[in-house]
Amino acid sequence: MTKFEQLDTMLEQGNGYITTRAVTTQGISKPYFAEYARSRELERVAHGVYQSRDAWPDDMYVLHLRNSNIIFSHQSALALHGMMEREPHHIYVTVKQGYNATHLRKQGVIVHTVSPEIFTLGLTSATTTFGNTVPTYDRERTLCDVIRQRGAMDVQTYQTAIREYMLHGHKNLPHLIRCSRALKVEDDVRRYLEVFLL
């Protein structure tokens, strides 16, 4: 397999996206990749991230490719899990305390910071509208995050998230209680459980 064929395979596996980091990890030089990008007419959509002309623009996926230390959370996680009726106006992420997220805030991303102990609690992955996989929190962690931040979101989004979770057939209630304890919203979660499940 030639290097061009190898890069074509990587581009296909990335749903039309490829990163300089992934290319150099495979032992392919940056000048060679630059020639490949020119010949395939790839568009540079972010520093080190290239997109083929036939790929759908996917802001969440590009943000993930540029920032491996973020987890999509809050309203973005609600959208990924189908727990809200409309797409959020901004992208919401969570980072670990100590992570410098200034560049994200400058891009209009809403950044939440948590301690390292709870950063990976409920970590999973989900598929964006355009078919790309990104890291996010599971439904239980997302519900707890929403309850914690209820004053910072509109009432309709909040109520829809609670209703969608509580009426959904697949709930992991023991995990929900663990998340609610870690995020200090256990009393609120138990109140909602009593209303919806009893």
Predicted regions and their residues:
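Residues in the helix-turn-helix
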Residues: 32
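Nucleic-acid-binding surface
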Residues: 4-6, 10, 15-22, 26, ...
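Glycine-centered, phosphate/nucleic-acid-interacting loop/turn motifs that mediate DNA/RNA or nucleotide
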Residues: 40
